[in-house]
Every structure is written in C-alpha cells, then in structure tokens.
Design a protein with these regions (language model features):
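Acidic, low-complexity Ser/Thr/Gly/Pro-rich repeat segments typical of extracellular/periplasmic
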Residues: 3-8, 13-128
Length: 128
C-alpha cells in the first residue's frame, strides 16, 4: 500500500509484504570504521524479540571466525544493536549477517549480508 501525504508517496510499512533490513551502519564496503563501533541494522517491520540473538544477527571476521558480541533490540522493535565484547580486528574485513530473523507477525526477514573494515583506532584513542 502507498500512502500519499504532503511530502509525496511513502511506503506503508505496516502493510503485508516482504520484511527486510532497510539500512546497516557501518554501511556495506565501509572502511576506516572504529574498532569499537556498534553495528546497527534498521528493519522494515518490528522484529519478534524471540528471533533476535547472536545466531540470527552476527559479525564474523573474513575467514569465518565469529566476533563475540551481544545483540539488543530497540523498544520499537525496528533497530538491532550489535556490540562486540572485544575490539574488532583492524584491517580485517568483517561480515555482517542477518539470517533467521522474524518480524512480530512471524514472517521471515529477507537475509542480509554486508561487509566493512575497521581501522587501527577505537573512539577512546581519540583525544578529548
């Protein structure tokens, strides 16, 4: 369903249809990412909290080693927040995978993969 308002057409995210990851930060192909940066994923529909865990939303180093971390869900159910429990490896490509998530209606979220590369710095390394 398309809604029309003062600012043009917009998608009605409550309508039936596919459920997908609309945005990930750091973005696909990002470089120079701080080693302590959380990974954020915005969903088109609220997630079923029971489907949100480190098996369904994870970060791995190139080569397949999973990075230990925790994943939280925002109160509105649309934002996944993954935080590493150690600093990310600098200069190593990291793969973000969302696979096995469901929305609050039980519909499968379309699997997502993206990549980013941390630099040698963490935010705490910066002065000030």
């Amino acid at each position: 369903m398309i809604l029309r308002g003062h600012h043009g057409a917009a998608r009605d995210s409550s309508a039936a249809g596919p459920v997908w990851v609309t945005k990930v930060d750091p973005g696909d192909g990002a470089t120079g990412v701080f080693r302590d940066t959380p990974v954020l994923a915005r969903l088109s529909h609220p997630a079923d909290a029971a489907s949100v865990h480190t098996g369904s939303f994870r970060v791995e180093e190139c080569g397949g080693a999973e990075v230990p971390g925790v994943v939280l869900l925002s109160p509105d159910g649309r934002l996944l927040i993954w935080t590493a429990t150690r600093l990310l490896a600098p200069g190593v490509e990291h793969l973000v995978t969302a696979d096995g998530l469901k929305d609050h209606r039980g519909r499968q979220v379309v699997p997502h993969r993206s990549r980013f590369m941390p630099c040698a710095l963490a935010r705490d390394d910066l002065p000030g």
